[in-house]
Amino acid sequence: MGVVALPALAGCGSSDQPHAEIPTRYQIPIPVCTTPLPPVARKAGGRAVVRNLDPEQWMGVVAPTFNPRGGLGPTDTDCTGHYLFANESLRGGISTKGWPRPFDPEELDLRAGPEGMRVLWLRVLKFENGDVGGPVALVRAVDDRAEVYGIGSFRGPAKSKVSPVRIGNENIAVAESTICPDLDDCRKRADFYLARRGRLIDSAQVDLERTAVVPSVTERGLYAKYTLRTDVTYKPNGIQLLEQVQVKIIHYDVGERDSDRDLRMVEFSRFLRVERDTLFSSNDPLWERVVGQD
C-alpha cells in the first residue's frame, strides 16, 4: 500500500471541511494509496468521519504529482505509478486545450455513494463521435486520510455518469450511458467496474434500455419493434437482473394490413455473480435470444 503526502492539504483547517459520519463496522476494501489529511475529532459512538474534499484536493490524492498551476500533462501518473491517460479505451482522445492542460474543476465529475465512497471521473478528452473520457477512480476520505481503491478510465457520451455502488463486501463503480445513433436503434447501457489490484476492471456490460426495429419474420412486409427494460437490484452476493422485452408490430400504411399491435411480452431473470476479476452471468442476455424471432 503506497503512502503519499499531500502538501496542499496541510494548511486546511478541520473546521472548513464539511463531513458526515458512518459506523466503523462497515467492511471497507484495502486501499492501494493513502494520503494523510489534517485530523478531525471523532464523535461519541466510534463513528468514522467522512470528509469532503474539493476537486484540486481530490486530484492531488489520485495523482500526487498534480500541480494546479502547472496543469495536466499527457504523461502524468496516478498514485499507483500508472499513466493517467495511457489506456486503450482512451485511444484517439484529444485534449482540445492542448498540453499541459489547465485544470478545470468543472471537468471533474464527483458522485457519492454508500459509506462515504465516491467516484471521480476526469472528463478532459474528446473523441470524434462526441464522446468524452478520462481517468476514473474509486475513492474515500475518512478521518485523517484519503484512500484510493481503484483507478481506471471511462469513455462515453457527455451525459454519462459513473457512480459508486455496494454489493455485499464489494464496492464497485457503475457507469451509465445512453447511445442513440438512430431513434429506432437506441440503448442505455451500464458498465460494472470491479476494483482489483489497484485497477478498476470493466467486468460486465448490461443493457438497461434498448430499442430496435427490424423486418418481421412472421408478418412479411411489416416491421417489428423490440423494447427492452431491465430492473437492476444489488444483492449481497451479486446483481439481480430482471429483463423484459416487449414485441409489437409497428404501424404501417399499406392496404388493410393489421399493423400497430402488440405481439408478446417476454420476461427473464438472470444473475451476475462476482467471480475473481469478473461478474459471471447465469445466462445469456434476453435481448440476444429474442430479437429477430417476433
Predicted regions and their residues:
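Short beta-strand elements that form the blades of beta-propeller/WD-repeat-like
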Residues: 116-126, 170-179, 239-248
